[in-house]
Amino acid sequence: MNDDSNGRRRRPAAFPVGTEDATSRELEQTPRRAPGSFSDKIVMTPDADDPFIETTAAIEALNPPEARPPRRRLSFGKIAAGAFGILISLAVGLWVDRLVRDLFSRADWLGYGAVAVVAIGAAAFLIVVAREIFGMMQLTAVQALKADLAAAAVAGKAQAARAATARLVHLLAGNPRTAKGRARLADTEGEIIDAPHLVDLTERELLAPLDREARRIILGAAKRVSIVTAVSPRALVDLGYVLYESARMIRAMAELYGGRPGTLGLLRLMRDVVAHLAVTGSIAVGDSLVQQILGHGLASKLSARLGEGVINGLMTARIGIAAMDLCRPMPFRALKRPSIGDFLADLAPGAGRTESATGKA
């Protein structure tokens, strides 16, 4: 098609369709900056001249190292406890047998009633034992799954990672917080994903909401311990409430991550947590360390009871972090492990400003 009477053809050109965006036109008209070099040098501040280095080191010193379950070994103490347990069980059985025989000698209906009571008690005892054994096996299965996921990520075997991920999905299937993550992982079943990336994706989708809930549990327990310590009249009350709140927090942490421990399982978890903190030397907080975190001026203005409340709250937070390490079915890879600094601003408002200033520096 000709565009004039001389028969010359129109050259190809581009024409905008519709209205142009005013922002895009302004960007096109704005002249671009020419490349250039900058002569300003980066000044590194030595650690000796850093005014926040002591506070940063003090906060990092409060973070307990990652807790790992100790190896279960057969010791002479366990053998002795088992032997004495069998002996006590035999003694109780003989006493019950003698009691039932004596009741039968007095009256038949008393004997049959005693037999019925013994049968009901034995059945209830067996149910309790079965629940405790199931709880211990569940804790062991969580630790085995944690080791399998870590090994699959290191070895790079996609099939092993898929199998371990499926076990984790089955473990957390009853938790409504993981519904969205389980749906997203189900959409990736037909895709080809490397083992490390699959493990990281599983951690982000399944454990991110659980980690947020675990932080909330730890912070709530630490706040309650701080308040009770500040207002309680006796140190014995402080110790009792710290033990109660720690046991409650550890049980909630285990149930959150699918552990569901019984009484013996809870005692085992508490023993592992306390043993880990005692071995690593992070069970107590020194006064000098608290002064570095809170500031000497603020620490001197605080009352003794309020200072003890902050100390017990920090100790409870460290117990919660160690319990989180033991109960979590995956090691921390893609997500950040919580630290004392995450809870310090809520327990000690003055320390929160110090920590923020440290981060800006």
Swiss-Prot record:
Bilayer topology: Multi-pass membrane protein
Entry GO CC: plasma membrane
Subcellular location: Cell inner membrane
Pfam family, one: DUF697
Domain of life of the organism encoding this protein: Bacteria
Annotated InterPro entries: DUF697, UPF0283
Bilayer-spanning residue ranges: 76-96, 109-129
Keywords tagged on the record: Cell inner membrane, Cell membrane, Membrane, Transmembrane, Transmembrane helix
Basic and acidic residues: bias regions: 22-31
Region feature Disordered, mapped onto this chain: 1-40
Keyword match Metal-binding: no
Family classification: Belongs to the UPF0283 family.
Record protein name field: UPF0283 membrane protein Smed_1530
Taxonomy of the source species: Bacteria, Pseudomonadati, Pseudomonadota, Alphaproteobacteria, Hyphomicrobiales
